[in-house]
């Protein structure tokens, strides 16, 4: 029977499947951080249980850490409790921890792949909604709740219902300057923020195949923003080249065996998907969100939509509510929208390729008057590489702030947050009301678009001179 990539990985991980119960699947890698793990560790202690597979559990600190200082004294009281609790729990249960002083510390969905923890054909879970990022390697990766975190810790398994399958094909090749972020925002704009609900999405087509691993991670990272359980890209030579030699990747004879196994991780030609979506890559322009969810997106040469043009009453009301919150008027040219904050970072766009793209638009320029712009590398390794290439100097000379790794301004959980009324060009993944701070307004863009907005003081079409 022909199978999709998802079905192949799923079937190889089903431990037991009983009638009337969700199947029990095996988990290969469990990633944890300081925010969603304390209750799970406490549950193990109360029940007197050990960690089932500490060697398959990896911890880091990212959500509530400071990007200005690696000192515990820089943390808020609650953040310090979370960080110190994770330290204690990892020591007690024998979990490998990349703490704020470790050179490889970083955002969990950045450091996992770059250390080779993420591998094709594996099942990966984390108490974080953007775990789908790891699907870029042909892994089945998804976020779980705290009670599920405890279940995985105790059993290395999880009960899950099998999802439906969706193929999203991006045909042809994108124009110069169009990035993975533009591709995924265009996809969400087409199918909506709930278009993938109930599905595991496989991204394919020439435009996807042409992406680097960093780009594929950006696309899969935002699968959750279209409602999908997970996103996947079939592994290929680009995947293997990225993983070769990384710390936790197979070595020697095991590497050759892995390459052979990964070659089978592709959807069979006659496999049938439950749903299919097609986009033409050549139609994709630089994208940015105008509203309060990732599906409210438009091309840079487009206009803020007019709710009066919408016949669906529910959609019309949603547009009206969003426009009121973001303080934009229907018909406004997106290039006329000014910003006063810029955030380049997050598990969506904080890898070395992202910083290189942003630096191209910052080099030799200055951040516009009245604009505050920060660049937050996704990990210690990304920061080290960027500094070796001189990217930090480019940003600093242009007036950007260069920070330590962490989730930072993606969410208003740590000290990096917006004030009410701030309008931010952000490379993160969510633009919900208050996501970056109470009363703040977020526009999701690529790193290149964010850097260009920082120096112009407003959104610009990076395909043109500005």
From Swiss-Prot:
The keyword Metal-binding applies. Pathway: Amino-acid biosynthesis; L-leucine biosynthesis; L-leucine from 3-methyl-2-oxobutanoate: step 2/4. It comes from the Bacteria. [4Fe-4S] cluster binds at residues 347, 407, 410. InterPro entries: 3-IsopropMal_deHydase_lsu, Acnase/IPM_dHydase_lsu_aba_1/3, Acoase/IPM_deHydtase_lsu_aba, Aconitase_4Fe-4S_BS, Aconitase_4Fe-4S_dom, IPM_dehydratase_rel_enz, IPMI_cat. Keywords: 4Fe-4S, Amino-acid biosynthesis, Branched-chain amino acid biosynthesis, Iron, Iron-sulfur, Leucine biosynthesis, Lyase, Metal-binding. This is 3-isopropylmalate dehydratase large subunit. The gene is leuC.
